C-alpha cells in the first residue's frame, strides 16, 4: 500500500539512517540515491510519487500505519473509529420492527395512483441491489485494506447494517406482492446498471486510489442513496406509505453514521499521508462528482417519466438536491466544492433533517428506535418500600 519512496542520503546523516531502517522494517519499496554536493535542502531528501516529502511527514506516516494488523485489542490507535462503531450499534434495529399493514392498504385500496405505484416500483427495483453493493464495498474492498482492528470493527458494523437494509427493502417488496423477478429487473434499465457499475469501480491498491474510493463511497451512500430517500419520503408527507417512510427514516440515520465514519477515514488518511490528495486527484474527484450528478439525473428522469410530479415533488428539485448534497459531503471531508453550479441552500426545505438523520417516529403509533442502548450512566439509589 505504501508507495515507492526515493531518498537521497548524505554521509553522516543520522536521519537518513533512521529513515532507511524504518522503510526496511515496514517492507516499503524504496531506492537510495547517492549524495550530490550542492543540492539544497535538509537530508534525507525524500520523494513519494514524484512529490518531495519532509522527513517528519514520512516518519509519521510510517508510524501511524492504518494498514497493519493490530497486535492486541487495546490500546486503540484510532479512538474515533470505536466511538463511531459504538454510536452505530446503539441505534440498532431489525426489519421485523417495521409495520407495513397500512402500506398494503394504501397500495391495494386505490390510495396510491397507478403513476405513484410505478414511481415507487421503479425506486424499489434498484434499492435492494444498491444496499447489496454498498455492503460489498465494505467487505470486499475496505476491510481488505484497513487492518487496524477498531477501524475494521467499524466497517464490519456498517456492512452488517447494510444486510438489514437489504432485508427491510426486500420485505417491503414482498409485502406489496412484487414477484422475485423484480429483484433482477434493474438489469433491464441502463439508468440503473450504470449506477451500479459506478459503485463497483473501486481501486484500493494505491493510496491515491484508496482516497478516491473513499470519496466514491461517500458519494454512493451520502448522495445517491439520499436522492432515492427523498423520492420515497415524499409519500410520507401526504400520509401515504408510512411503513416505507419508517424504513427510509431508519436507513437515513444509519447512512449518516456510515458517511461520518468513511469521511473521518478519508480525513485521517489525508492527515497521515498529506502528499496523497493533490490538485490532480481533486480534479478526478470533480469528475466523479459530475458523474454521480449525471447518473442521478438519468435515474430521476426514469423514475418520474410515468407520473410527473409526485406529491408536490418535482424532478428538478431532486436533481438540485443531489448537487447540493455533493458539495455538502465534500465540505465535511475537508474538500473544496466539487460542483460549482450547485445551489448554496437546500432546494427542498422539508428534507433538511435528512442530513441529521433524525427519527420522526410518533411514539404512540410505531416502534421507536430513537434511543441509545446502554445510554444511562451513574448509580441508582432508592428507598425501600414500606409494605
From Swiss-Prot:
Leading EC class: oxidoreductase
Active site: 169
Catalytic activity, as annotated: a 2'-deoxyribonucleoside 5'-diphosphate + [thioredoxin]-disulfide + H2O = a ribonucleoside 5'-diphosphate + [thioredoxin]-dithiol
Cofactor(s) required, per the database record: Fe cation
Residue numbers binding Fe cation 2: 162, 221, 255, 258
Any one of the GO BP annotations: deoxyribonucleotide biosynthetic process
GO MF, any single term: ribonucleoside-diphosphate reductase activity, thioredoxin disulfide as acceptor
Cofactor notes: Binds 2 iron ions per subunit.
Keyword entries, A-Z: Deoxyribonucleotide synthesis, Iron, Metal-binding, Oxidoreductase
Matching PANTHER family: RIBONUCLEOSIDE-DIPHOSPHATE REDUCTASE SMALL CHAIN, RIBONUCLEOSIDE-DIPHOSPHATE REDUCTASE SUBUNIT M2
Record note on quaternary structure: Heterotetramer composed of a homodimer of the large subunit (R1) and a homodimer of the small subunit (R2). Larger multisubunit protein complex are also active, composed of (R1)n(R2)n.
Described function: Ribonucleoside-diphosphate reductase holoenzyme provides the precursors necessary for viral DNA synthesis. Allows virus growth in non-dividing cells. Catalyzes the biosynthesis of deoxyribonucleotides from the corresponding ribonucleotides.
Record family assignment: Belongs to the ribonucleoside diphosphate reductase small chain family.
Full protein name: Putative ribonucleoside-diphosphate reductase small subunit 067L
Annotated organism of origin: Frog virus 3 (isolate Goorha)
Amino acid at each position: 500500500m505504501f508507495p515507492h519512496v526515493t531518498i537521497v542520503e548524505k554521509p553522516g546523516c543520522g536521519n537518513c539512517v533512521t529513515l532507511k531502517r524504518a522503510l526496511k522494517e515496514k517492507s516499503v519499496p524504496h531506492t537510495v540515491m547517492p549524495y550530490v554536493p550542492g543540492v539544497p535542502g535538509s537530508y534525507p531528501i525524500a520523494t513519494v510519487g514524484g512529490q518531495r516529502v519532509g522527513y517528519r511527514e514520512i516518519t509519521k506516516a510510517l508510524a501511524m500505519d492504518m494498514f497493519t494488523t493490530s497486535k492486541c485489542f487495546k490500546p486503540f490507535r484510532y479512538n474515533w473509529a470505536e466511538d463511531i462503531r459504538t454510536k452505530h450499534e446503539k441505534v440498532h434495529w431489525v426489519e421485523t420492527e417495521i409495520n407495513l399493514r397500512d402500506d398494503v392498504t394504501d397500495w391495494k385500496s386505490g390510495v396510491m395512483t397507478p403513476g405513484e405505484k410505478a414511481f415507487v416500483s421503479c425506486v424499489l427495483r434498484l434499492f435492494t441491489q444498491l444496499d447489496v453493493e454498498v455492503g460489498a464495498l465494505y467487505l470486499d474492498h475496505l476491510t481488505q485494506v484497513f487492518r487496524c482492528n477498531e477501524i475494521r470493527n467499524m466497517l464490519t458494523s456498517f456492512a452488517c447494517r447494510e444486510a438489514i437494509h437489504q432485508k427491510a427493502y426486500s420485505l417491503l417488496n414482498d409485502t406489496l406482492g412484487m414477484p422475485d423477478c423484480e429483484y433482477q429487473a434493474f438489469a433491464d434499465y441502463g439508468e440503473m446498471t450504470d449506477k451500479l457499475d459506478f459503485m463497483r469501480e473501486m481501486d484500493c491498491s494505491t493510496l491515491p486510489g484508496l482516497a478516491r474510493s473513499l470519496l466514491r463511497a461517500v458519494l454512493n451512500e451520502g448522495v445517491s442513496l439520499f436522492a432515492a430517500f427523498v423520492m420515497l419520503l415524499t409519500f410520507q408527507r401526504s400520509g401515504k406509505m408510512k411503513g416505507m417512510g419508517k424504513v427510509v427514516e431508519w436507513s437515513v440515520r444509519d447512512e449518516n453514521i456510515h458517511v461520518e465514519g468513511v469521511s473521518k477515514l478519508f480525513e485521517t488518511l489525508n492527515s497521515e499521508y498529506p502528499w496523497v490528495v493533490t490538485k490532480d486527484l481533486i480534479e478526478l474527484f470533480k469528475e466523479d462528482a459530475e458523474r454521480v450528478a449525471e447518473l442521478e439525473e438519468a435515474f430521476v428522469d426514469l423514475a418520474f417519466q410515468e407520473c410527473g410530479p409526485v406529491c408536490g415533488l418535482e424532478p428538478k428539485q431532486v436533481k438540485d438536491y443531489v448537487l447540493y448534497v455533493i458539495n455538502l459531503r465534500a465540505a465535511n471531508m475537508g474538500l473544496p466544492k466539487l460542483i460549482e453550479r450547485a445551489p448554496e441552500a437546500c432546494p427542498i426545505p422539508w428534507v433538511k433533517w435528512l442530513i441529521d438523520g433524525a427519527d420522526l417516529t410518533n411514539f404512540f403509533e410505531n416502534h421507536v428506535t430513537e434511543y441509545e442502548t446502554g445510554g444511562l450512566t451513574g448509580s441508582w439509589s432508592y428507598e425501600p418500600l414500606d409494605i
